[in-house]
Amino acid sequence: MGKSNSKLKPEVVEELTRKTYFTEKEVQQWYKGFIKDCPSGQLDAAGFQKIYKQFFPFGDPTKFATFVFNVFDENKDGRIGFSEFIQALSVTSRGTLDEKLRWAFKLYDLDNDGYITRNEMLDIVDAIYQMVGNTVELPEEENTPEKRVDRIFAMMDKNADGKLTLQEFQEGSKADPSIVQALSLYDGLV
C-alpha cells in the first residue's frame, strides 16, 4: 500500500473482503477514512492513544489503548497498517461471540503464552478502570480492579491453578451476561 493512495488495489480489496465481514464498498470507505486520518498509511501507538482519548475524555485510556494497539499490531512492527486495522475492527465489531472471545483472550494474554494469569488480568482491568475514570458507578464487590479480578477468577478458574486457558475464559465469559453484553456493544454499529 503506497503512501496516501485514496484507493486500494482491487486484489487487496478482494482479499480483505474474504478475511473480514465487510463488503468491498465498506472496505474502500474505511480505507478512505484511514488514509485521511493516517496519511502515511500507518498508525503508531501515540496516534492510537489519541483516538482513544477522544472516546474516553474523563479518564486516562493510555494504558488500555496500548494493550489494544498491541493486539491490532499483528506483525509487531510498532505500527498498524490498514489491513491489520480492518481485520481487527471486523472481529471486534462484527465477529461471532467466539471470535470476539478469542480476540479478548489475546488482549488479556499479555505475554502470549496461551494463559491469562491473575497479574495479566489485573493489568488489563486496572487499565479499564483508569480509562473509564469516575464515569461508571461500580458495585461494592467490584469497586477496585483487585476485587473484579478476584471475582472473575473465582468464576472462571475451574481448576484453581491461578491461570485461565482459552477454554476456561470462553466458558466463563459466556456464563457472565455482563461480559457477553460488553462484547456485543458494537454489534451493528460498524
Curated annotation (Swiss-Prot):
Residues 174-190 are annotated as: Interaction with IL1RAPL1. GO terms for molecular function: calcium ion binding; calcium sensitive guanylate cyclase activator activity; voltage-gated calcium channel activity. Keywords: Calcium, Cell membrane, Cytoplasm, Golgi apparatus, Lipoprotein, Membrane, Metal-binding, Myristate, Repeat, Synapse. Ca(2+) 3 binds at residues 157, 159, 161, 163, 168. Pfam families: EF-hand_6, EF-hand_7. It is a peripheral membrane protein; Lipid-anchor. It is found in: Golgi apparatus; Postsynaptic density; Cytoplasm, Perinuclear region; Cytoplasm. Ca(2+) 2 binds at residues 109, 111, 113, 115, 120. It comes from the Eukaryota. GO terms for cellular component: Golgi apparatus; perinuclear region of cytoplasm; plasma membrane; postsynaptic density. Ca(2+) 1 binds at residues 73, 75, 77, 79, 84. Residues 24-59, 60-95, 96-131, 144-179 form the EF-hand domain. A lipid is attached at residue 2 (N-myristoyl glycine). GO terms for biological process: regulation of neuron projection development. Its main location: Golgi. Binds 3 calcium ions via the second, third and fourth EF-hand. Monomer. Interacts with KCND2. Interacts in a calcium-independent manner with PI4KB. This binding competes with CALN2/CABP7 binding to PI4KB. Interacts in a calcium-dependent manner with PICK1 (via AH domain). Interacts with ARF1, ARF3, ARF5 and ARF6. Interacts with IL1RAPL1. Interacts with RIC8A; interaction is favored in the absence of Ca(2+) and myristoylation of NCS1 is not required. Belongs to the recoverin family. Neuronal calcium sensor, regulator of G protein-coupled receptor phosphorylation in a calcium dependent manner. Directly regulates GRK1 (RHOK), but not GRK2 to GRK5. Can substitute for calmodulin. Stimulates PI4KB kinase activity. Involved in long-term synaptic plasticity through its interaction with PICK1. May also play a role in neuron differentiation through inhibition of the activity of N-type voltage-gated calcium channel. PANTHER family: CALCIUM BINDING PROTEINS, NEURONAL CALCIUM SENSOR 1. This is Neuronal calcium sensor 1. It comes from Pongo abelii (Sumatran orangutan). The lineage of its organism: Eukaryota, Metazoa, Chordata, Craniata, Vertebrata. The gene is NCS1.
